[in-house]
Amino acid sequence: LPGVLGFKPSVLLLTTGYALGYGMMGLSGAELLLSVSFFLVGIAKGSAMNACTILVSGNSADRTRGMNLMHSCYACGALLCPFLIAAAARVSTELAVFLLAAMGLVLWLVYVFTPLHGGKSKSSTEKEAIDWSFLWSARFWLLTGLLFFQNAAEQSVNGWMVTYFKGSGIIAGTLAAYTVTVMWGATLVGRLLIAFVFPFKKPRKAMVGMSVLCTVFYVLLVMAHTQGAAIALLFAFAISMSGLNPTAVASAGRMTSVTSMGIMLPVASSGAILMPWTIGMVAERAGLAAGMASNIVPCVGLSLIHISEPT
């Protein structure tokens, strides 16, 4: 799309999905309309992530620090926004949804008044020539595979851990609902530490270490039988994985473009769709404990990817 409309017009067009999607959710509960609304919100989210990735990558002297700082902002929003929306929902569900629509409109206005450039030498409206050379890069596909497994492992824990903890009785009551808060809190802490306190001098070795640690902590997590151990291991798992996504994207280096990110991020995000679905299928046949155990596969995949990655 940027090759036809230009970078900024493309971003402005696609990010309207936040305001439109959430606005439609607040106005109607019709199933078809809700499906369209969620689709628009998903398009807007993908566009915003792609745009921010391109902008940060193209304007950062240290890509790894820049990407971790950007993803820290993402984690901060994911940590705090649910509390704001929950407070609004106490008044009415419609108010909560319209508040999300208003936030989407604010984001769109930020893009309107911000000079957007698809790179250091590209104007915001310039129609970019598409370079497909990254498709023949083994490093590009290995990084995409790494992100695929990271998304699969992380979103499976986000989506299923509350159900698993409640069903197994490991964490009872309202505390189980705050496990996602623990994850996002750990993620925020980890990314800020990488950005400002412990910057990576050798990103590849750092990613290997993070991959191994998140695998170890996940194995221990599914073996936990007490509330304290489960919370501590969940925090450790999340903080060990926190820097993988931004560091992997930053490692794309010169391959970072509107087109390459438009392929890398959606392909990687499919892991967040397939693995939670797989856990559900396994859980139906063998129980939720077996389903959660199957999430060890993408965790191990993170480590195996590095064996094939060129140095």
Stretches with model-predicted labels:
Residues 1-26:
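Conserved MFS/SLC helix-loop-helix module at the cytosolic interface between two early adjacent transmembrane helices
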Residues 1-6, 190-202, 283:
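Helix-to-loop junctions at the C-terminal end of transmembrane segments
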Residues 6, 27-32, 61, 224-225:
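Helix-breaking motifs and short loop linkers at transmembrane-helix boundaries and internal kinks
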Residues 69-116:
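Helix-loop-helix hairpin linking two adjacent transmembrane segments in secondary transporters
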Residues 303-311:
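Residue-level detector of conserved catalytic or cofactor/ligand-binding positions
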